[in-house]
Swiss-Prot record:
Belongs to the betacoronaviruses M protein family. Changing residue 119 to P: In strain: Isolate Shanghai QXC1. It comes from Severe acute respiratory syndrome coronavirus. Glycosylated at N-terminus. Changing residue 27 to C: In strain: Isolate CUHK-Su10, Isolate TWC2, Isolate TWC3, Isolate TWH, Isolate TWJ, Isolate TWK, Isolate TWS, Isolate TWY, Isolate Taiwan TC1, Isolate Taiwan TC2 and Isolate Taiwan TC3. The chain crosses the membrane at residues 19-39, 50-70, 79-99. Homomultimer. Interacts with envelope E protein in the budding compartment of the host cell, which is located between endoplasmic reticulum and the Golgi complex. Forms a complex with HE and S proteins. Interacts with nucleocapsid N protein. This interaction probably participates in RNA packaging into the virus. Interacts with the accessory proteins 3a and 7a. Residues 1-18, 71-78 are virion surface. Signal peptide: none annotated. Keywords: Glycoprotein, Host Golgi apparatus, Host membrane, Host-virus interaction, Membrane, Transmembrane, Transmembrane helix, Viral envelope protein, Viral immunoevasion, Viral matrix protein, Virion. This is Membrane protein.
């Protein structure tokens, strides 16, 4: 190490040579998360990515707070304070939106840091909830050998005649209704259908399916 406390080029090369393997594994893990960690592909990697995203918020906030406390000068200190306030407000807005979505759907997917759009499909007396990246005007349903898929998500076994008449897509501010449109059976246990959006408003999902009516949402008061 140099007299002024900095490291030399040779010392930097030695550090890189010693940590090359670890750095390679870290980059490989990052590539796997970016390329394969999707909710409709690999649920295990997707959960790891969500945990990583959750941890990034407090770690980033702590970095800016420490940069403000142990500032190099007043300029960097001011920038650190401003960035800490911005990150804190962004983190707070995430929690506000997540709790509003949870109040609407009662699903733990509401705290997904990647998206605040949830697909809700009533099947066999329960509501199956999965995350969506965007809200579409039309949502397709495909049944392949008795297994239902919507928006790339596998939702379980279902026959074409047992498809729900209505599904919903929830955000922190709205609940959109989709009604079953055209459907077509293909073979004995396959088929496809389309759901068209016909209503949108400030509703919350009714998770009580004890009744037999098809209206699965109540207006938020």
């Amino acid at each position: 190490m140099a007299d002024n406390g900095t490291i030399t080029v040779e010392e930097l090369k030695q550090l890189l040579e010693q940590w090359n393997l670890v750095i390679g594994f870290l980059f490989l893990a990052w590539i796997m998360l970016l390329q394969f960690a999707y909710s409709n592909r690999n649920r295990f990697l997707y959960i790891i990515k969500l945990v990583f995203l959750w941890l990034l918020w407090p770690v980033t906030l702590a970095c800016f707070v420490l940069a403000a406390v142990y500032r190099i000068n007043w300029v960097t200190g001011g920038i650190a304070i401003a960035m800490a306030c911005i990150v804190g407000l962004m983190w707070l807005s995430y929690f506000v939106a997540s709790f509003r979505l949870f109040a609407r759907t009662r699903s733990m997917w509401s705290f997904n840091p990647e998206t605040n759009i949830l697909l809700n499909v009533p099947l066999r007396g329960t509501i199956v909830t999965r995350p969506l990246m965007e809200s579409e005007l039309v949502i397709g349903a495909v049944i392949i050998r008795g297994h239902l898929r919507m928006a790339g998500h596998s939702l379980g076994r279902c026959d074409i005649k047992d498809l729900p008449k209505e599904i919903t897509v929830a955000t922190s501010r709205t609940l959109s209704y989709y009604k079953l449109g055209a459907s077509q059976r293909v073979g004995t246990d396959s088929g496809f259908a389309a759901y068209n959006r016909y209503r949108i408003g400030n509703y919350k999902l009714n998770t009580d399916h004890a009744g037999s009516n098809d209206n699965i949402a109540l207006l938020v008061q």
